[in-house]
């Protein structure tokens, strides 16, 4: 079983395509980014996702993506939008893990050897998942650069993680077989000209599912 997250969704149509394709998680970005969405629009998408998932008798988790935001604002948005999980993609301290419980907390790491990252690598609470992304100076994700699969595979042997960084419908199967992650995360890899592509979303989910069988 592989968990598939489609991140950076900004429209209801793309969110519903992800649900229909079989995605397990949909990421809504609240951090400065070209994929940023305002909380009111996100709440509309979240409601549509829940209805579509219920119709299919499936559970689809809504994940809010934040970068160096404060806990109070994160919790406020999470409540407004009915989020299931929080992804921290900045330099947040490990104390956020306890502050944001019982939400699922996904912490992005990039093997940059920073002190806060070492703290998160030592954190082992049941509601925390690590997300391995590529180390791109000045970027907090969505850059389309492939992560370090060797280090990710080593970490995946010790704890469940999501693999991100440069994944596409063409390479996600290889990534799953090599790293054996708990889940995979894609954003730019299912876009055409900077916009989510319905066909690529479907192809990505299908390729991930086939590789995990």
From Swiss-Prot:
GO biological process: L-tryptophan biosynthetic process
Catalytic activity: N-(5-phospho-beta-D-ribosyl)anthranilate = 1-(2-carboxyphenylamino)-1-deoxy-D-ribulose 5-phosphate
Family: Belongs to the TrpF family.
Record flagged with keyword Amino-acid biosynthesis: yes
Secretion signal span: none
EC number per UniProt: 5.3.1.24
Top-tier EC class: isomerase
Pathway named in the protein's UniProt entry: Amino-acid biosynthesis; L-tryptophan biosynthesis; L-tryptophan from chorismate: step 3/5
A GO molecular-function descriptor: phosphoribosylanthranilate isomerase activity
Keywords for this protein: Amino-acid biosynthesis, Aromatic amino acid biosynthesis, Isomerase, Tryptophan biosynthesis
Species lineage: Bacteria, Bacillati, Chloroflexota, Chloroflexia, Chloroflexales
Protein name, per record: N-(5'-phosphoribosyl)anthranilate isomerase
Organism of origin: Roseiflexus sp. (strain RS-1)
InterPro entries in the record: Aldolase_TIM, PRAI_dom, RibuloseP-bd_barrel, TrpF_fam
Amino-acid biosynthesis found in the keyword field: yes
Superkingdom of the source species: Bacteria
